[in-house]
């Protein structure tokens, strides 16, 4: 969709394009705000992706690896006991989980990491860098680099390394070099900044596997397209399970890749509500949160114009969340666009609400979700009472919670 759509358009007949404008924009969001040294690399990446998607050998190899290496397709699971929990008498929606936690490496992240690794090989780039917050993208990137024999360097904030020590060990075990970032808040924003600095310095030999639908064009489109397999599978599985599209899609949003992967194939179906759930941290009113769409203003971060958490001087504010994967002060530009035109809805839940949701799913379904996923699950408390029987909710279970067990144990110990 080009930038011809007016700001805050609520046109119900709006048809959304699969591609941003020629300048990499979704409405007024997106673009390429990067040093000139990176423009050739971004152009090369966009052209390589466009060529690859038209190449049957590329799509065949990607599809085969997604099946035999990643373990796709992932199930659409009917959460019967969770559904029962939210019933009012016998009234309430039915809840389904799209089980991305069952992918190799335990999250959705490998869909994108695998696709970009194949592109890097096509471009002749043998050195790979990536940023990571919760560690899942770092593990996924280290995994595909091991699979293809590529050099791998992961940038991770020191605070996130403390919170996600298990994933740090996994990355090292897979042969990656994990470089701690101590600048700023020592979290995802700072790790991303360091990765971009590395890329500027080594652009001729290095490909940056960016882990979310953020950053300069073509990354928001590229990452979304590699994750769209989530929604494509879900659409087919919903038809098989209950004969139609779901009424509501629900996914957590930090940068927003798992949500865009689920949402994208449904965007033109106006009968489907799409709800992204951000991290309210200690509460939006406290200032200690990562609710970018809920509270942010337009600005530029990491190469793209989008909604950002900013102070009165336009400086990027620190984000806070119990979830390292949502602890980011920006969001992908397509999410900002979907919010502005009224196609998607966004809400925020607190750390405590996410913890409670993690415990609930664990006890009701025997599935321990990632803290990121738990934010989407927590919104069921507000959503389910508004829906009648016969409504179908699909939640993207974006990752498993093994990595978060220590954090959860500490919080519950403190609480008790």
From Swiss-Prot:
It holds the Pfam family PALP. It catalyses: (1S,2R)-1-C-(indol-3-yl)glycerol 3-phosphate + L-serine = D-glyceraldehyde 3-phosphate + L-tryptophan + H2O. Its cofactor is pyridoxal 5'-phosphate. InterPro entries: Trp_synth_b_CS, Trp_synth_beta, Trp_synth_beta/beta-like, TrpB-like_PALP, TrpB-like_PALP_sf. Pathway: Amino-acid biosynthesis; L-tryptophan biosynthesis; L-tryptophan from chorismate: step 5/5. It comes from the Bacteria. The modification N6-(pyridoxal phosphate)lysine is found at residue 109. The keyword Amino-acid biosynthesis applies. Tetramer of two alpha and two beta chains. The beta subunit is responsible for the synthesis of L-tryptophan from indole and L-serine. Belongs to the TrpB family. This is Tryptophan synthase beta chain.
